[in-house]
């Protein structure tokens, strides 16, 4: 009998599933190099947040971030201020003395960051800390030193003098309640004193060592000295103390830093 043919074996193809290629890892945001302007400004903010205001990144309020940012900018401004005043003293320069009853300073933080060419640096430093410069700057209350065109003109003059490297000092009054707020009560307008110093101001530097005694009232005592010259002396006065506060004024590009000196009255 003929042999039966064995059925041919079916070939089975084994297909192995390929593992999907791993997705490329997301690139981490580049951190500023140690010692870079952004890193230094960021560290200065954190240092003031901790050492000056006893806060950390978790407990800090928006106002704390504003104060710490102002202090970080002020550090750099004061270094230039000291250099400027040392140069003026060594050259025995003549100064312009500008007197005004009001100064409308505007937003001091943003203006100083622009003049010191630190705006981009501060923006990047705050962004690393999870903060936005515009929102932080909104915390700044207007200085109660003036309101109107003449006050704004006086502030612009001080900016211009510093930008032009002209030695100058502005003089004014350290108002405690310079302006007022308007509210409505029972359909009537009510004025309320606006204490702009309630939360302190990081730009003010108290100078008690330059205080002066200011005599008030009294009478004039006339006399003659040994040479027969007539002398007049104010006696029986009531005295007040004038205590100065300085606000550094930076010119554009930080070339010079002059200052505005405001006088506060205190009991003698």
Named regions from a protein language model:
Residues 2-268:
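A conserved ligand/cofactor-binding region detector
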């Amino acid at each position: 009998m003929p042999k039966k043919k064995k059925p041919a074996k079916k070939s089975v193809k084994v297909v192995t599933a390929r593992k999907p290629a791993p997705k490329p890892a997301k690139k981490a945001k580049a951190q500023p190099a140690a010692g870079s302007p952004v890193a230094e400004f960021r560290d200065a903010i954190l240092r003031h947040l901790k050492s000056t205001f006893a806060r950390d990144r978790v407990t800090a309020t928006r106002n704390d971030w504003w104060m710490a940012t102002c202090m970080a900018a002020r550090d750099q401004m004061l270094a230039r201020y000291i250099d400027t005043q040392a140069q003026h003293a060594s050259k025995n320069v003549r100064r312009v003395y500008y007197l005004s009853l009001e100064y409308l300073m505007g937003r001091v933080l943003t203006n100083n960051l622009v003049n010191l060419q630190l705006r981009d640096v501060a923006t990047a430093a705050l962004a690393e800390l999870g903060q936005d410069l515009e929102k932080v700057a909104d915390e700044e209350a207007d200085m109660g030193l003036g309101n109107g065109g003449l006050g704004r003109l006086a502030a612009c003059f001080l900016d211009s003098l510093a930008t032009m490297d002209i030695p100058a000092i502005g003089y004014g009054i350290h108002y405690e309640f310079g302006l007022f707020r308007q509210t409505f009560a029972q359909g009537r307008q009510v004025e309320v004193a606006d204490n702009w110093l309630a939360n302190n101001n990081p730009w003010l530097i108290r100078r008690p060592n330059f205080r002066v005694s200011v005599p008030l009232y009294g009478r004039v005592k006339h006399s003659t000295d040994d040479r027969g010259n007539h002398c007049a002396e104010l006696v029986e006065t009531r005295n007040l103390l004038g205590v100065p506060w300085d606000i550094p004024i930076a010119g554009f590009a930080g070339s010079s830093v002059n200052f505005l000196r405001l006088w506060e009255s205190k009991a003698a």
